[in-house]
Amino acid sequence: MKFYSEKNVYEAALERFRYIFREFYGKRPITISVSGGKDSTVILHLAKEVMDEMGIDKIPVLFFDQEAEAPMTIEYIRYVMNLPWVEPYWVQSFFREWNASKGDWFNVWGPGEKWCREKEKDSIGDLVIKKNTFFSKAIDSVLLQLFGKDYLNIGGLRIEESPARLSTLTHNEVLPGITWGKFGGTYKDGSYKKLVLYPIWDWKTNDVWYYIFKNKIPYCKLYNYLFTKKPLQGCRVSSLIHEESIQVLPLIKEISPGFYDRLVNRHIQKFRNLLFRNK
């Protein structure tokens, strides 16, 4: 059963950000994770609205670069990391990422290997991340190393995207009266444990794009190509080594053929497996 509020999702999201900054700013590290996608774009700019209200000048923004990122995604991330109110953390450290497909591992930024693209000049490349791990555990390791065990990270998950996210973000309180997150709590000494919050958990895809277009917010231009191939809800920007990226690979071949060749040569067996399963 659905219960509707008198507030719209935009007003509700702003209230959530106000709560986050009011309760935790200056008391624990607050960060925003971005992927280059539409949801993290909205998160970033909603945060800026509330930062302006509260007189907050900058916020740490983390991009955990998985190497096999589309050129247009990287172009957009460079724009984000140069915004005057962003404190940039662009991580390009080695780890082996698992993609749940029978031994398909990818040596992200593998030492001595020929990468899909060169690293950024000021990126963070010396973090020690457990090599064989899921992405969620890898980014947790990154956040712990950069911001400490009491970090509060803000992300862009939404319940519309999957039943699993619906269950995760509507059950189990992480703060009093708040279920739209994970982890949380305190240690025996009263200090904070790590916490991740998702303030746009109840937004629909149309809400996301309405906010972006209404406010004329720059976004990753890869979406413009995806709009011509897929329904709006199916347009996603993510690392190209994920299994679902098979739907995007033909488009990457068309718009960035040089990068596509480097990507396939980088991990040719991975993409052979993906293409075979897609057929």
Go through the PLM ranges and name each one.
Residues 1-33, 38-279:
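Nucleotide-activated chemistry modules centered on ATP-dependent adenylation/adenylyltransferase
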